[in-house]
Every structure is written in structure tokens, then in C-alpha cells.
Amino acid sequence: MTSTNEPIPTEEEIKNGFKFIQDEICKFLITTTGGHQQYSEDKWDYTKGSGGGISRVWEGKEEEGFYLNQDYQSQNNKCDKIEKGGVNFSYIVGSNLPSAAATQFKIAPDTKYIATGVSLVIHPYNPNVPTIHMNVRYFEAGDVWWFGGGVDLTPVYPKLDQVVEFHSTLKKVCDQYGQEENKTSYALGKAECDSYFFLPHRGETRGVGGLFFDHLKSDKAKTWKFIYQLGLSFIDLYKPFLVNNSSISYDKVQREYQLYRRSRYVEFNLLFDRGTKFGILSEGRTESILMSLPAVCKWKYNYKPEENTPEANLLTFLRPRDWLNENQENKN
């Protein structure tokens, strides 16, 4: 199915669009974190074909106890806000699809393929600022093509009104640029996200969800417009958390709980994440694939937070909920 109203995007337009998304998000992160915390840039070449990528990575200071001083954290605007983060752009072209990936996608192994997109993860220092992940991508092999992507939020100390606003912003993007017939509606994307970002061995979701889309292959022009706008929406989605929550003081208990909860993030990425599996199977760039992992995390044996604590409150958020219809009288 093709659109009769809009021109079909070219490979070059899609590539340049993703690069623009990376640039805009990086500008936003630098400005919003005060301008002093810069990323390191790593340009790399795809050795098994042509193309490559640009990885932009933030790694904060590592002094022990540096981010446990409440007065410093709440008053000094020069404090690093991103402990570990990255915004990666890639565009690769190969002449032979790796056999493992070919089997997964039911494509002949000797088929030329193109893969491009932007992937990002931000792990903040402050436990009151959620971790966020976003991915927008395009894949083409022979006559087969599709778009995919999504965004999801992983808070440690969630506030209901902020979670509702996050989902409201996502719904606005879907209402304006998505289509039910193109499988890019908010309802479908949210349901897929709740299902995908689930840890079966823990019986909980990774966070408070968001949107997840994969193998979108209907109406290339409209789907590209949706994916492009979804990528740019990151700024509106994350700005309230980064601006409003970074100045909230926190103590050692909260920092320790943040590190403990990050272990769930690592478990999901290494055990279940399709992007990680595909990257490894397709002999992708390991540094870029594992960029999403936090700098520090902890596991505690059989740990359970005490009842009626902010730490226990998080667990009530880690299940699929109809966020847009939550009772605002029960704000946390």
C-alpha cells in the first residue's frame, strides 16, 4: 500500500531525517543540563559493508559520594545531571544479510540490506529523574522494508501526574501523525509497549511504558512522517523531568534504591531486548549495542522494600495501567 497524497521518502531523506533527530536531541540535552556537560563523539565505519555511525556518549563524574550531598545536588547547577547516556545514529549497508538475521526475518542470506536509525538511553544521577529510552529505525532488504521504534520511561520515584502527562504527550503525537489502519495509534503502541517491556521472571514491567512499534510496512510516506515526529517528540517528553526533577534533593537510601532498580534494566536488555539480540546476531558494533547499559547498578539477594515507603510505591506502577484515565485524586 502506498500513499497517494505524499511523496514516498527516499533512502537519503530517511537517513538525513534520523541524523537531524540525533542533532536536535543532543542540542536539547546539552542546553537543558546547563551547557557544561558535553558528550564525547565517536564516528565509526561499518567494516562489513559501507556506512557507519556517530555515537555521542555522556559519562558523568565518578567520585565516590559526589552525588549524595543534598545541598550540592539541589543548589549547584553545574552538577552533572547525566551519569551515563548516549544518542546513537547509524546508517549501514551490507551485501549479505547475516544468516541468523536472515532466518529471523525470513529473507535470503545473500540479500543486500540497509539499516538506519537513532537509539538513545539516558541514565540520570538523580533518582527523581527517570531513565528514558527511545529508538526510531528503518530496515530494508530487497523488496522488504519496515519502520520501527518507540519510547519508554523507567522511573524510580514516579509521580502520577508526570506519568499521565508523558502518556498524554505520546497520545497527541499518535493522534496527529498516526493512523489506526497503519497500526500507529496510541492504543496499539501502548499495548505493544506494555507487552514488550515486561520481565517475566520478575512479574513486572520495566517501567511505566510508552509506545512500541515494529515491522510497520504500510504506507511508507505516512509511516515515515509518524516515526520522524515520534523521534522529535523526545524533547517534549523528557524536558519536564530533566528540568523540574533534577533539582530535587535525594539521600543515600534513594541512590541505593536507584542502583538496585537499574539491575532490572540490565536484566531486560541482556535477556529479552530484540535490538540487543539482533545487534549481536548481525555482528554489529558491540560498543554501540551495549551503550544502553548504566554505568553502575546493584543486585541485592531477595530484597523487598518496606511497606508504605516510597520504594514500595514504585511497585504499584510496574504493571499495565490506563494512565490517561487515572483518577487524579489519587496522585502520588
UniProtKB/Swiss-Prot annotation:
EC number: 1.3.3.3
InterPro entries to which the protein is assigned, alphabetical: Coprogen_oxidase_aer, Coprogen_oxidase_aer_sf
GO CC annotations on file: cytoplasm
Origin: domain of life: Eukaryota
Molecular function in Gene Ontology: coproporphyrinogen oxidase activity
Catalysed reaction equations from the record: coproporphyrinogen III + O2 + 2 H(+) = protoporphyrinogen IX + 2 CO2 + 2 H2O
Pathway membership, UniProt: Porphyrin-containing compound metabolism; protoporphyrin-IX biosynthesis; protoporphyrinogen-IX from coproporphyrinogen-III (O2 route): step 1/1
Positions of the catalytic residues: 133
Pfam families per UniProt: Coprogen_oxidas
BP-aspect Gene Ontology terms: protoporphyrinogen IX biosynthetic process
Keyword Ubl conjugation applies: no
The protein's enzyme class: oxidoreductase
Annotated SUPFAM superfamilies: Coproporphyrinogen III oxidase
Keyword terms of this UniProt record: Heme biosynthesis, Oxidoreductase, Porphyrin biosynthesis
Residues involved in coproporphyrinogen III binding: 119, 135-137, 284-285
Record function comment: Involved in the heme biosynthesis. Catalyzes the aerobic oxidative decarboxylation of propionate groups of rings A and B of coproporphyrinogen-III to yield the vinyl groups in protoporphyrinogen-IX.
UniProt subunit comment: Homodimer.
Family: Belongs to the aerobic coproporphyrinogen-III oxidase family.
Protein name: Oxygen-dependent coproporphyrinogen-III oxidase
Organism, as annotated: Dictyostelium discoideum (Social amoeba)
